Amino acid sequence: MERLLALMARLRDPVEGCPWDREQTHETIAPYAIEEAYEVLDAIQKQDWQAFPDELGDLLLQVVYQAQLAEEQGRFDFADVARIVTEKMIRRHPHVTFGADVLGHTRQAEGAANNLPASAMPGQWEMLKEQERKRSAQLGGQKDQRLGALAGVPPALPALIRASKLASRAARVGFDWPDVGGVLEKVHEEINEFSVEMHKGDREKMQDELGDVLFSIASLARRLKLDPEACLRQACDKFTRRFEAVEACLAQEGLSMQDQSVDQLDALWCAVKKTEKP
């Protein structure tokens, strides 16, 4: 770790560092953190354990890079980042006894300790996060009433993930359908409203209504305990697999997709589907 920190400091050296790295700011390198996180996810999904440590390293580099920029500005350094996340994880695990290697002293677990079932952990985690948000707001001079149920959901999240989190937060305070059937009815209702605007041809209203359709579908996934982002990734993978299979079938005959009719392509698509395991 020390070598990596020293390397980043060297890359940012005003005299002997890398010209490109010296020019970067928090804002210019921020997109790389998202890109690297998705590459980590891709390696996990593919179970590419050879590439996995490499991708994790690329993601870690983004954390080190941002910390180096902050250190240069006198805000904090990497040690602060590690300390803050360690203290946060300790706070959020009151049911675990940590030794001197973590705390510098031993601590007895609180409450029911390790008797807490795993199913209770997400609820406890969210409760502790909410307490932290309130303390943070109070330290910042905000009043409790400004911390609504949706506080802390970052607008920069991918839209499907954000929709799922917003719906989940709302459900925790009772803003939810009594059963999954109600959510499904809402999906159909939003699709019908979109259909009306689509036939009118008003693109602004179409966008608004299609957004409602997507949000309601994310809510349906949340109610079914499904990850909407994972569901869509799976659908994308399936589409890619089938599309490439159609291309391969045509290539074997020396044909291209552009020369086929819609009916011919649909027939090939259905044939590919039948070859897949149910």
Question: Which residue stretches match the model-derived regions?
Answer:
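Flexible "arm" and connector segments at domain edges
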Residues: 1-55, 61-210, 214-278
